[in-house]
Amino acid sequence: DKVLWSTPIAKANAITELKRRDYNPMPLKRVNIRKSNGKLRPLGIPTMKDRAMQALYLMALDPVAETTADNHSYGFRKERCTGDAIHQCYINLSKESSPQWILEGDIKGCFDHINHEWLLNNIPMDKVMLRKWLKSGFIFNKQLFPTEEGTPQGGIISPTLANMALDGLQTMLEAKFHRVDLYSPKRSYYPKVHLIRYADDFIITSISKEMLEQEIMPMVKEFLQARGLTLSEEKTKITHIDEGFDFLGFNIRKYKGKFLITSSKESQKKFQRKINEIVNSHKTIPQESLI
């Protein structure tokens, strides 16, 4: 709508407009950005007013989301980052007795395909407002398109909605693989099944490839199906720790029993490309200034 709140006065005046009554969000502006693999990622950009309204409701929703979140969910959460997720990988996989098999999970178009009815039935917030945001549509090439599924990447509240849709997977796995010590019933343990998730990227560990294929994978697929989601066949695979796997820009493996965490080859290539861009765009400046 070409409206900017660029001054303190404009922002102060805008506060008085943030009312639920007669509020109707504008369609999102669709912009495609290119990912590192060459594919395009659609972003939905809301107006300033819609962004502010989402932020207002997020202030109430976020504390609720934190109380129901999986313990080992690290994406789009305060005081958590990729480093915490990688540290949890070290805790779960570094010991000699640690699980050896890993399911590398990637959800296909997570933000674009979350089922609207599931969100409306399960997200504890104003249903009228949530429905308006989910059904606001988007404009691309000057044409208006409806939104029948998904929550747009670019919306302030979208990461929290996606996280809440995926929360519960860890609890489900723990309930399934919970074991009670026969000799000491008060003690319990889990047979090396651990979930570590960052947004829509996750890994699940296990003692065997068969357990991942025959028990865990069907559970994950059923969990996602209820939310309108599926696993990416291209990116989801089962790997032995000795072969190593890439997760959040790092490569994690064991070599001759030693646990190693290094930057992934793709991360190294991305870093090299960035350096090349900087050098090529500053060819005329002195060497000491470039460094």
Each language-model region and where it sits:
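A conserved non-catalytic segment of reverse transcriptases
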Residues: 227-291
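Conserved polymerase palm-domain catalytic core
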Residues: 17-21, 27, 31, 71-72, ...
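Active-site beta-loop-alpha junctions of metal-dependent nucleic acid enzymes
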Residues: 78-82
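Short helix/loop capping segments that flank catalytic or ligand/cofactor-binding pockets
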Residues: 43, 53-54, 112-115, 174, ...
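Charged boundary/loop elements
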Residues: 59-72
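Amphipathic alpha-helical blocks
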Residues: 2-27
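Active/ligand-binding-proximal structured segments within catalytic/core domains
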Residues: 53-61, 161-162
